[in-house]
Structure formats: structure tokens, C-alpha cells
Amino acid sequence: MNTKVPIYSINGEKRGEIDLPEIFNYSVREDLIRKAFRAISLSLRQPYGSSPLAGLRRVGHTTKPGLGISRMPRIAGGSRVVGIASAVGGKSAHSPRSTKKLYVGINEKERKMAKFSAIAMTASADAVRKRGHRFSESLPLPVVVEDAVSGIKKTKDAVNLLKSIGLYEDILRSKEGKHIRAGRGKMRNRRYKVPKSLLIVGTDSVSLKVFKSLPGVDVASMDSLSIRKLAPGGVGGRLTVYTESAIEKLREANA
């Protein structure tokens, strides 16, 4: 891993160098990254369940023995069976319940180790390329830009910055990889899937929102940085751009 990386200005030119914090030398635990991603993803599920009265809204009377028919609850004056699992429109035997525990926990130490591992993998060129990202061969990772990029208001300026640094190729990869989703999701306002490209990390994600209009780009503040953004799908090594302030905040992290 590089101990020093260049700082790029708002014009994409090298403005100086910065010492990387020790967190980028953290011992990577890919198993914990997968575990943390799974726990977070499963905990975001929406509770669902059937009504407790489903299949029980008809009054059925059980017949006495000796009538030559099975003793199942039937509608009065008729032969239709109601209220049991084997009947048409009857109660489901084991229906889903909204009270089911969906939250999946993870140890606090493991969660921190997973986050530190994912951050460390953003500085590994091999891990980033293995994940499928495309960038300039001579570009040292992680990419650090000056805080002035938070003042960019036009997408055109953001594109010019990424082109001059050597990161725009990954945006094109995401744009070309956009495809129609398989399955029912295409009918439910999730028609397209777009591959993940850059992650822009700063101290304030609102000021970096101009980058969100680019295909596959996510922005995050240091407070909102999570495994879901650092390692989509539980696979670390996302191509990440940090601001100077974000690097200084990482320096304070207790790795």
C-alpha cells in the first residue's frame, strides 16, 4: 500500500501529497465484510404477514358422527367446508407473521473490523480491479481530492474532474452495464439494474450530490459510511474517492 498519495485539485491537477492514515494498513477480514453485509441487508427487510382472521371469516358447524360424511366444519344448511387448511379459501396452516423477528445482529467488534477492512481494501489496486472497476494503470489508490470539489454545482464540471484524474472509464463501464432486471421487479419501479461505480466520501454528502447524477456513483459522509456502500454485495474493494477532510477524519479512527 502507498504511504503517500497525491492530492488532486478541482481541475484534476496534482496539488501536493498527503500521508495516509494507519487504517489503510488494517488487516483485511473478507469473511467479516460478508457477514456484516448480510446482517445489514437482512435487517432492512420489511415485515409482512397475513391477517390473523384470514380464512376464519365464515362460521362453520361440525357435524355429529353417523351421518355418512366427514366431520369437518361446514356452512349451516350446506356442505361447503370452511375454516381449515385443507378447505378452499380456508385458513393457511403456517402463514407468515408480521411479528417474526427479521433483525440479524452482529457483534460490535466484528462490525467495526468489517468496516475497517472495507476501508483498507479501497487502497488495494488489486482488490479494486478484481471487483471489476476500471481506472488508469498509473493512478495510486486511494484517490484523494481537495475539499473544494464540494463546491462543484454542474455535472459537466464533475465529469471533467473525473476524466482528468483517470476515473471516468469506470463511469462508462457502469453506463454500458445498465440492463433490464430479470423477474417481477421490472414491474415494481425497479426496471433497471445499474452496476456500482465510484464512491465519493466527504464530510458532508449533501455538498457532493452533483456526483450522484452519474451512473453507479454513490456519495457518503464519514458518519453515514457503511458496509453497503463500501462493499456492495459483500465484496470489498470499491473504487473510492476521499476528500482531504475525510482522510483527516479517518486518521482519528481507532483502528
Curated annotation (Swiss-Prot):
Keywords for this protein: Ribonucleoprotein, Ribosomal protein, RNA-binding, rRNA-binding
GO biological process, one term: translation
InterPro entries linked: Ribosomal_uL4, Ribosomal_uL4_dom_sf, Ribosomal_uL4_euk/arc_CS, Ribosomal_uL4_euk/arch, Ribosomall_uL4-arc
Cellular component annotations (GO), alphabetically ordered: ribonucleoprotein complex; ribosome
Protein's UniProt keywords contain Disulfide bond: no
GO molecular function: rRNA binding; structural constituent of ribosome
Similarity comment: family membership: Belongs to the universal ribosomal protein uL4 family.
HAMAP family to which the protein is assigned, alphabetical: Ribosomal_uL4_A (MF_01328_A)
Binding partners and assembly: Part of the 50S ribosomal subunit.
Role noted for this protein: One of the primary rRNA binding proteins, this protein initially binds near the 5'-end of the 23S rRNA. It is important during the early stages of 50S assembly. It makes multiple contacts with different domains of the 23S rRNA in the assembled 50S subunit and ribosome. Forms part of the polypeptide exit tunnel.
Protein name, UniProt field: Large ribosomal subunit protein uL4
